[in-house]
Amino acid sequence: AVAGLVRPKSGEILLDGTNLVGKSTDQIVSSGVTLVPEGRRVFSNLTVEENLRIGAYLRKDSLADDLARVYDLFPRLKEREWQQAGTLSGGEQQMLAVGRALMAKPKLIMMDEPSLGLAPIVVRGIFEIIREINRQGITVLLIEQNANMALKVADSAYVMETGCITLSGAGKDLLNNEAVKKAYLGT
């Protein structure tokens, strides 16, 4: 609903005091919200750089500084900037999906299952990047089944079951919560 893909049955979604409900997806992106979808969804036949430029499709300013910033965050993408996105590894495609979202200069970046299907070493790298994005002042809304990794990077966390919030608190507090440990962390 926040990205404008589904209309909520009731309520409001406020970002800096502006209600996003009923706004088109391009209006939502213009307001500072981007999405890194589950399964990466890169444009396979386009190059890495073309995919990144698509992330900035609503912008009218120069992209050079932001391309450089994404390439600094993901040096591997710089090495492959002219390679077709469909030939990248799963981890590289995830980096590209995150980089594409960053090209819109978001205030809020939503990430849906960024660890899905990735090797454990790649997952650790992705979560380090999530920390770095947040350190840069961008709010990250993380939807993730890897509760252990998600809670380690979360300032605030919410546990949902069948669409309802059942627990909330600081990430580190929920990481140490016995009910969360038993149900989601396997301990």
Question: Which ranges hold each PLM region?
Answer:
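Glycine-rich phosphate-binding loops of nucleotide-dependent enzymes
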Residues: A1-T187
